[in-house]
């Protein structure tokens, strides 16, 4: 049963496949039923594992890769639970990022953005975030 279903989904782009598999698992495994509290805890656990691997550095690239995939899968499960379109949510986030950079470039110039210290940059970023 699983083999056939998983095989049918394997031709989808990875995020779409993850979303569909997450949906499928909630229909075939009672233990996989998602609720917000469970998913929040699961996300915290996966992010903690991911950050642990990131702190290990570049030599741990394979584990970073694996843990990032786990984080993304939990995010897909949360998206399914709340009927959030992952593509549109990502597009919105990217558009906001571009808008903030364009605001900063227009107000301060590209050189200021390039040469700002991390502290300076995040002060400017906070300003840009407040502008809609």
Where do the protein language model's features map onto the residues?
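Flexible "arm" and connector segments at domain edges
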Residues: 1-68, 73-132
């Amino acid at each position: 049963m699983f083999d056939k279903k998983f095989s049918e989904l394997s031709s989808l782009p990875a995020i779409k496949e993850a979303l569909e598999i997450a949906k499928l698992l909630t229909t075939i495994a009672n233990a996989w039923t998602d609720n917000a509290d469970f998913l929040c805890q699961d996300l915290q656990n996966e992010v903690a594992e991911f950050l642990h691997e990131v702190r290990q550095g570049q030599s741990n690239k394979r584990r970073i890769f694996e843990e990032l995939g786990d984080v993304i899968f939990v995010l897909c499960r949360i998206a399914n639970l709340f009927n959030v379109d992952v593509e549109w949510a990502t597009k919105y986030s990217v558009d906001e990022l571009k808008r903030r950079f364009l605001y900063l470039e227009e107000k301060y110039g590209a050189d200021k953005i390039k040469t700002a210290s991390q502290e300076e940059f995040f002060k400017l970023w906070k300003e840009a975030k407040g502008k809609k």
